[in-house]
Amino acid sequence: MNPYIKQFPDLMSGKKIMYVHGFLSSAQSGTVKMLQELMPNATLVAEDIPVHPEEAIEMLQKMAETEKPDLIIGTSMGGMYTELLKGFDRILVNPAFEMGNTMSSMTGKQEFQNPRKDGVNELMVTKGLIKEYRDFTERCFQNITPEEQERVYGLFGDEDPVVHTFDLFHEHYPQAIHFHGEHRLIDKVAFHYLCPVIRWIDDKQNGKEQIGRASCRERVCHRV
C-alpha cells in the first residue's frame, strides 16, 4: 500500500476530483490511476480534451458546472486550462501558460501518448494551431480576485525542461511552490508535494485548523 494512503486513508473522502490532462495525453493517462490510488475514497473524473483550445475550454467549463468537483487538478496544458476554471479549489502542476512557445518546436505529426475515446492516435501541429494557443493563453490571469488567489496552488518542478512559468504564475497567485523534479507528475512528486497540498485543501474544506501557509511551503519545498 502507498505509504501516504496508510497515513491519510481518508484524503478527500467522499469528494470529487476533476483531472485535466496535458498536451498529447488523454483521460487514460497513468496520472489518473495514480491519483485514484492516492485518494481511494474519492471520485475521480476525467475526459479527453479537444485539441482546439476554444472547444477545450467550452467542454471543461461545462464539465466543471455539471460535475461540481471539490478540487480540480491540471497538469501542463491542463494546468493552463485549470487556471481559467474559476470558482473551484485548484492545483496547477507545471502549468503551460505559454503553450504557443512550447509547441513551436513540435510542428509536424505528433502521436498521442495515451489512447483516446475518439480513436485518434496522432495530431498535426501546424502554425495555425500554434497561433490558436498563443492567442488563447492571453486569457489567463484575468479578473483574479483575492478569493481566487486563496483557491489556487501552483507546483513547479525545479528541473522542468519544458515549462518555465513559476515567475509568471507568482505575479498573480501567492501560493507558488517549487518541488524537486521535472515536468511529469511521477509518483514521488505526487507523494511528497502534491498530496500535502491536497490535504491542506481537504482540511480547509472540512473546517480543520490550518498551519501557516509559509511553514507549509517551507516543509513541502524541502521534502526529498
Predicted segment positions?
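Gly/Ala-rich beta-loop-alpha elbow adjacent to hydrolase catalytic centers
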Residues: 73-83
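Single conserved hydrophobic/aromatic residue that forms the stacking wall/gate
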Residues: 211-224
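Active-site catalytic motif of lipid deacylating hydrolases and related acyltransferases
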Residues: 11-66, 183
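Short hydrophobic segments within beta-strands
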Residues: 19-23, 73, 155-157
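The alpha/beta-hydrolase serine catalytic core
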Residues: 89-209
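Residue in the alpha/beta-hydrolase core beta-strand immediately N-terminal to the catalytic nucleophile
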Residues: 70-73, 89-91
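Short beta-strand-to-loop junctions in surface cap/lid or active-site-entrance loops
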Residues: 2-13
